[in-house]
Amino acid sequence: MTYPLIGNYGVCREDCESRRPWPDGFIVRELSRMPSNFRSDCTIQEYLEIHGVPGIAGIDTRALTKILREKGTMNGMITTNADYCLEKILPRLAEYTTGKVVEKVTCEAKYEIRGVKDLADNGPLSGSAVFNKEDFLSGKKEKKPSLVKELSGAGKRVALLDLGAKDNIARSLAMRGCDVTVYPALTSAEEIIADRPDGIMLSNGPGDPKECESIIAEIRKLYETDIPIFAICLGHQLMALATGADTFKMKYGHRGGNHPVKDLSTGRVYISSQNHGYVVDMDKLDSKVAVPAFINVNDGTNEGLSYTGKNIFTVQFHPEACPGPQDSGYLFDRFFTMMNGGM
């Protein structure tokens, strides 16, 4: 974490976008042990301990950030062994890769979320209906939160492929009256198509997109249908790979909630939330398949694609926000319009 003091306001249930924290390690300069916020449900230390995430404090994270900025993303290690042998450790660090992490973070089974106009407590869709601190810390999810104003039969049916999806993707669809079925990442295209969705969403997720070979093969089958598709972040990259494009690893990626992206169709610039280390290579795009729709104002890298002759559009940034600016939330409205036969 680049800010020097972390944990001032603790961990709040309503802010959680997944059933548990997914980092393999957590590094801070100074950890606040007495959070001061009426919304706080536990400390960061409690949260990490329950989920087995190792952490370390007392690190000059700003100096570390400068190194990563200049040298690029690199492998690192947190250890409790003060007598480690550097000569033995370095080869292990050099060989380390994240691997097929999507399979670790996806949901275990298919589940459904009904379309609504509002959420009773604006809580996370994967959370418990009644807050219980022990259940929250352990990641236990027995119930969905209460939903109000159900739009029975009025909503479009959306298939959401969970590649590590943030809750607010499903929430953004449900708030527009869509009935959302969430599928594990390794679900076959045939199963999704058999459920006859009005639209398909490919979610965000972690890791190198080229590690997702089997998922890419299924996405290719989804591309060949006439079902409208909207993809975000990792989903955007996988759709590109499924249709013959390429991706590459960035020096240190885009991280944070203040990245300007330009809509090439209007010239308008939006501030976006981003968290990715890979990007689609625009030099290897086939214009007969897809054309750039958004670019990053800072470095000119690709931030979105529009697929030629298809009801498919994808973005690298996070229109669902949570956290971050909500400037591009209109893209969910665009997807809804597309499912209704518009463009």
Across the structure, where does each feature detected by a protein language model lie?
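Catalytic beta-strand/loop cores that center a nucleophilic Ser/Cys/Thr
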Residues: 268-309, 343
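Cysteine-nucleophile active-site neighborhood
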Residues: 199, 203-279, 324-340
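A glycine-centered loop/beta-turn motif at secondary-structure junctions
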Residues: 304-343
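RNA-binding accessory domains that recognize and position tRNA/RNA substrates
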Residues: 1-190, 194-195, 209, 322, ...
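Residues that mark the start of a beta-strand
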Residues: 155-159, 179, 228, 271, ...
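Flexible loop residues that form catalytic
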Residues: 31, 205, 278, 310, ...
